[in-house]
Design a protein with these regions (language model features):
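Disorder-to-helix initiation segments
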Residues: 1-8, 12
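Short, charge-rich amphipathic interface segments used for partner binding and complex assembly
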Residues: 11, 17-21, 25-70
């Protein structure tokens, strides 16, 4: 079972790295002014989406930690 956990953990680590890259790219878009001229609701939806990605990353980190402890 620990081999399965190890394999799953490695896959989740790769996915987490990808999510972190996308999160940073989206955050940088806003700081670079890419949303300039957009409506307030659009900007708020963008912010909500970025925060949802951050929350998903935290949940994924928690799962990875749990899998690591069960190895």
């Amino acid at each position: 079972m620990s081999t399965d956990n190890r394999t799953l953990r490695r896959k989740l680590d790769r996915e987490l790295t990808y999510l972190e890259d996308r999160y940073l790219a989206l955050r940088d878009l806003k700081s670079d002014g890419a949303l300039a001229g957009q409506s307030i609701p659009t900007i708020l939806q963008f912010d909500d989406a970025v925060e949802s990605i951050a929350a998903a990353m935290q949940h994924l980190r928690n799962v990875i930690d749990i899998l690591g402890k069960s190895e």
